[in-house]
């Protein structure tokens, strides 16, 4: 039906007759002429309808926004002063010789150009209209281009695109599984995969050496601000590799994507920091290195002070006291400090002590703080020295369990940087390495910080069982601007070590056989050294396109309550369907 897309219409086509198809983006009457902005997937073209073409003009008069049309006409240069430099077709217009109305549109629930005033739920309910907005469509096109380039990159390096099952077995991977009842095996269930982890390891045992997949994953977890119950991963695995092999390849890929699509050079190599360094310095294992603010530990200085708020956590083996220095922050108002105090309370902090450094040369006389009277002068002097405080700064203190201090001051660090626009540079990638293998609260069972198939730096299973808290893993996360975009590890390929890890996690040999027997069996038939990584593709595309949420780069996302306003899913099903599956709904949970 068409000869061209909008982005191909330019001055090279002047005096040629072409045909376009699309939607009426806007219709304007000016001095006897009707102008139509025709929109297709690739952009906008201005169409001019002259009353001398009576049939065309009559159709043009009847057109409304979002009507579907086909236009044939000759390409002309726009009159002087009417060029639009913001679109590829901005130097030309189409003098319509024929317009065909292909379909009408009902009155719109919202104007395509006025989406800012429309709630997200309404936009998702009418997602097919929301997707007509050029900026939304552009993000989905960019997603397609990025995926295509990723495939090309990996194909050229010997990776095989292999699909793994969508209907698999429920295993304890952290979040709840989405379960699928089996009609042919009453009382039994499939699970939708949280990741292809076990299958990709088995593919390495099978000898495929280099695997990748753009794969959908599912997690029935309590949704946080920017999570989806179904999401897309770039998943890959390699045999006969060490950490550096995977990291170097993935750095090359990410550098290539940023160079190709954003014309942005990323560092070579990416910097590396340990998990311990990240937590102590930034309060998080996903540090935004554009942010110059850092945490400084002063726990040792507070062990002998009389101030209980500091002394108790300083003498608690699970406690921490840290200081966050904000340069030129002494000008913050009391209200601003109160707001930040309330903010850190979200993360469990009981307060936010502070010292304003008004004049560093006047000693304690140049400081202002409600806590000064509780601290010896030598301690205050050492705090100022460690934090490299200057006149005009403010020092914020966190004192509690280390987890609370890290999370609250880490979040405050991010908040201050955003509020005051302290960012240095645009893109700061980093590898976080040397994660603990296991983690737990003060008391309680050990949990795998990543997953139970992660290889360990310790090679003796007995030492792992004896001192799990001392063991580091061979895991690595790629972090970009404070977002984890990829995470992976070298995997365990020794059955004895795998049983040791499962034992630490409280999983008996019998339970392990029941849950992971297929993997444990495979490990006994010549498993090569192997490792891999998975990238959150939604997050990566959102970062690269500047989207504020991953929902903006997913064609049909769920809401924050895991619902689809477009289809009204999830929904009830017929009783007969439940009976066929041997299911019965006992009650509705609110």
Curated annotation (Swiss-Prot):
Organism superkingdom: Bacteria
Subcellular localization: Cytoplasm
GO CC list: cytoplasm
InterPro entries for the chain: Aa-tRNA-synt_II, aa-tRNA-synth_II, aa-tRNA-synth_II/BPL/LPL, Asp-tRNA-ligase_1, Asp-tRNA-ligase_1_N, Asp/Asn-tRNA-synth_IIb, AspRS_core, GAD-like_sf
Principal subcellular localization: cytoplasm
Protein family: Belongs to the class-II aminoacyl-tRNA synthetase family. Type 1 subfamily.
Task performed by this protein: Aspartyl-tRNA synthetase with relaxed tRNA specificity since it is able to aspartylate not only its cognate tRNA(Asp) but also tRNA(Asn). Reaction proceeds in two steps: L-aspartate is first activated by ATP to form Asp-AMP and then transferred to the acceptor end of tRNA(Asp/Asn).
Name of the protein in question: Aspartate--tRNA(Asp/Asn) ligase
UniProt source species: Coxiella burnetii (strain RSA 493 / Nine Mile phase I)
Gene name as annotated: aspS
């Amino acid at each position: 039906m068409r000869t061209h897309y909008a982005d191909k219409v330019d001055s090279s086509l002047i005096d040629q007759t072409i045909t376009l198809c699309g939607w009426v983006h806007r219709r304007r009457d000016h001095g006897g002429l009707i102008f139509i902005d025709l929109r297709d997937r690739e952009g906008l073209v201005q169409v001019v309808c002259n009353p001398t073409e009576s049939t065309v003009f009559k159709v043009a008069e009847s057109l409304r926004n979002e009507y579907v049309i086909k236009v044939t006409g000759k390409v002309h240069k726009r009159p002087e002063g009417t060029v639009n430099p913001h679109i590829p077709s901005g130097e030309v217009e189409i003098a319509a010789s024929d317009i065909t109305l292909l379909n009408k549109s009902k009155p719109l629930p919202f104007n395509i150009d006025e989406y800012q005033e429309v709630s997200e739920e309404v936009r998702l309910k009418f997602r097919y209209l929301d997707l007509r907005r050029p900026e939304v469509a552009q993000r989905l096109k960019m997603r397609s281009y990025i995926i295509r380039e990723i495939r090309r990159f990996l194909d050229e390096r010997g990776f095989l695109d292999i699909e793994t099952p969508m209907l698999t077995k429920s295993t304890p991977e952290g979040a709840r599984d989405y379960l699928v009842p089996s009609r042919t095996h009453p009382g039994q269930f499939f699970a939708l995969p949280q990741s292809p982890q076990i299958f990709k390891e088995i593919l390495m045992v099978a000898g495929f050496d280099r695997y990748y997949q753009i794969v959908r994953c599912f997690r029935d977890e309590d949704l946080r601000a920017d999570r989806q119950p179904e999401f897309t991963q770039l998943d890959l695995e390699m045999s006969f590799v060490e950490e550096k092999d995977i990291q170097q390849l993935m750095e090359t890929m990410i550098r290539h994507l940023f160079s190709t699509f954003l014309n942005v050079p990323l560092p070579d190599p990416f910097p590396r920091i340990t998990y311990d360094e990240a937590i102590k310095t930034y309060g998080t294992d996903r540090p935004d290195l554009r942010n110059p603010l850092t945490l400084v530990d002063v726990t040792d200085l507070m062990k002998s002070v009389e101030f209980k708020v500091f002394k108790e956590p300083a003498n608690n083996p699970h406690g921490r006291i840290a200081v966050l220095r904000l340069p030129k922050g002494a000008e913050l108002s009391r209200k601003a400090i109160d707001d930040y105090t309330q903010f850190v309370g979200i993360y469990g902090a009981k307060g936010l002590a502070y010292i304003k450094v008004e004049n560093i040369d006047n000693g304690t006389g140049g400081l202002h703080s409600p806590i000064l009277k509780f601290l010896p002068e030598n301690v205050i002097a050492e705090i100022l020295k460690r934090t490299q405080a200057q006149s005009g700064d403010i020092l914020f203190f966190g004192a509690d369990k280390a987890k609370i201090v890290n999370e609250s001051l880490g979040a405050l660090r991010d908040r201050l940087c955003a509020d005051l626009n302290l960012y240095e540079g645009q893109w700061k990638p980093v590898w976080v390495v040397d994660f603990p293998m296991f983690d737990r609260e003060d008391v309680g069972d050990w949990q795998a910080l990543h997953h139970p198939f992660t290889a360990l730096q310790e090679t003796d299973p007995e030492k792992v069982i004896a001192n799990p808290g001392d063991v580091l893993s061979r895991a690595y996360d790629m972090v970009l601007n404070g977002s984890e975009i990829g995470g992976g590890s070298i995997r365990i390929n020794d059955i004895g070590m795998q049983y040791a890890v499962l034992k630490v996690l409280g999983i008996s040999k019998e339970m392990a056989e029941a849950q992971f027997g297929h993997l444990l069996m495979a490990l006994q038939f010549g498993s090569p050294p192997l490792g891999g990584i998975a990238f959150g593709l939604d997050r990566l595309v959102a970062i690269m396109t500047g989207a504020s949420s991953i929902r903006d780069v997913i064609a049909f996302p769920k809401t924050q309550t895991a619902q689809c306003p477009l289809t009204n899913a999830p929904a009830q099903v017929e009783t007969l369907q439940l009976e066929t599956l041997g299911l019965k709904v006992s009650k509705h949970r609110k």
